[in-house]
């Protein structure tokens, strides 16, 4: 049976932590952590740093590439055991989970990992282990902090969210099977966040905390681990479509950037600014979302999101705005002449804003400075905005359909992971997804 933890090798035969059986929403064994045992985990990782530094780069890359390739194959033993509970825990359909894993893992396969390795240099020997506090909105994101951490030769503890505790230990276990010399340098665990007494030995024993989550949680970690925390907070994304762009071609890519992960990611498109015929684009986008709803069925809708989308639809009807006739779970497209950027309530919902003069957009987005992550750009006028969008804090621009598939070279939120993991003192905390 799957477990929500992977222990460093020196603790693998220990009687602690004990495990309890969880039945719903998925079946697995959950560890019962104490502060003493978590302290031992961090100590074991610190002692495993020397062995990690001795692994030849080509061996580390080979193990990583083979593990990622295995997890990209739905027919692999690892995926066949992991996919059913992972889909239930993440609230995604099997098809939606498959598409999401392809997007995330595709960016860290052997080729982009090798390119990142070529730029990596070892961290100082006394840098200490890294704690990566993972978010629960997307599956498999553990690989994004894990890869650069291993490439700079720092041991790592992946703290999984309680809502999805299975991917990280499963991936680490597969990686260790391919490169046993990693056994002392990696660990995964899940416990309720914010428990100060339980987390005290962990925060004290690590050198860096890479934390993904809400602002309140990041602020709390910074208070308890001052100077160690690199925070990745909530952000959102948008699209800009030039007047010369074929609406049908743009719509297909936009639909992917909206529907992937059921619109839960920081690179999920929440609004579209169109210089051309906004209604024509919205019509094509509705058709594309309906097609994706058949190929990537949405997961069960959360009640608050469902209520918010229904309210948005009613508001659009009262304002006589054009809106799609899609079933609510398939998506919602609304043409809104109010140019103010607003986040999406989710469930594949997007506003299309007609904006003939795209040069006005950066000023319209100014209130969102530092809270925007990505922009899907199509057309020359849209791409000319890239430098000004970057000034607002946007860290990724890509054609529609490619926004949610960054590779390992992406600086999430403008943060260079190799730099923050090798710097003697982390830079000021930045906000990203």
Task: Name these PLM-found stretches.
Residues 1-127:
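N-terminal Rossmann-like NAD(P)+-binding subdomain of aldehyde/semialdehyde dehydrogenases
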Residues 113-179:
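Conserved small-residue-rich beta-alpha loop and adjacent elements
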Residues 117-137, 191-203, 335-347:
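Donor nucleotide-activated moiety binding/catalytic core segment of transferases
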Residues 133-136, 159-161, 191-192, 211-214, ...:
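Short His-Asn-centered micro-motif
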Residues 152, 205, 225, 392-393:
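Short, structured coil segments at secondary-structure junctions
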Residues 179-271, 276, 404-433:
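Conserved NAD(P)+-binding/catalytic subdomain of aldehyde/semialdehyde dehydrogenases
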Residues 261-376, 383-384, 388-429, 433:
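NAD(P)-dependent aldehyde/semialdehyde dehydrogenase
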């Amino acid at each position: 049976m799957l477990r929500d933890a992977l222990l460093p090798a020196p603790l693998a035969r220990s009687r602690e932590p004990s495990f309890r059986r969880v039945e719903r929403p998925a079946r697995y064994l959950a560890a019962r952590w104490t502060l003493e045992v978590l302290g031992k985990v961090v100590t074991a990782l610190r002692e495993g740093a020397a062995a990690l530094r001795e692994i030849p780069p080509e061996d580390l890359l080979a193990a990583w590439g083979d593990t990622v390739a295995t997890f990209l194959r739905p027919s692999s033993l690892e995926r066949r055991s992991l996919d059913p509970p992972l889909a239930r825990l993440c609230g995604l359909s099997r098809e939606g989970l498959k598409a999401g894993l392809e997007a995330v893992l595709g960016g860290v396969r052997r080729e982009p990992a090798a390119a990142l390795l070529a730029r990596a240099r070892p961290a100082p020997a006394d840098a200490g282990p890294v704690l990566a506090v993972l978010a629960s909105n997307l599956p498999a994101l553990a690989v994004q902090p894990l890869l650069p951490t291993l490439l700079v030769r720092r041991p790592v503890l992946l703290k999984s969210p309680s809502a999805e505790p299975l991917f990280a230990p499963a991936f680490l276990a597969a990686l260790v099977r391919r490169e046993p010399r990693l056994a002392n340098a990696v660990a995964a665990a899940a416990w309720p966040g914010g428990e100060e007494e339980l987390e005290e030995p962990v925060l004290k024993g690590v050198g860096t905390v890479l934390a993904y989550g809400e602002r309140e949680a990041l602020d709390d970690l910074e208070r308890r681990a001052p100077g160690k925390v690199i925070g990745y907070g909530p952000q959102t994304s948008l699209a800009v479509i030039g007047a010369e762009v074929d609406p049908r071609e743009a719509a297909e890519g936009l639909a992917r950037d909206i529907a992937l992960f059921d619109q839960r990611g920081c690179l999920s498109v929440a609004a579209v600014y169109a210089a051309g015929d906004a209604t024509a684009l919205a019509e094509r986008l509705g058709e594309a979302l309906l097609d994706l709803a058949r190929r990537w069925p949405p997961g069960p809708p959360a009640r608050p999101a469902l209520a918010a989308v229904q309210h948005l639809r009613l508001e659009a009807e009262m304002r006589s705005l054009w809106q799609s006739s899609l079933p609510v779970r398939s998506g919602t497209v609304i043409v809104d002449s109010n140019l103010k950027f607003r986040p999406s309530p989710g469930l594949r919902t997007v506003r299309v804003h007609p904006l003939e003069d795209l040069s006005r957009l950066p000023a319209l987005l100014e209130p969102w400075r530092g809270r925007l992550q990505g922009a899907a750009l199509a057309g020359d006028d849209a791409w000319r905005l890239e430098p000004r969008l970057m000034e607002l804090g946007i860290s990724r621009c890509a054609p529609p359909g490619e926004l949610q598939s960054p590779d390992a070279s992406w600086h999430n939120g403008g943060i260079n992971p190799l730099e923050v993991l090798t710097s003697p003192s982390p830079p000021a905390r930045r906000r990203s997804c």
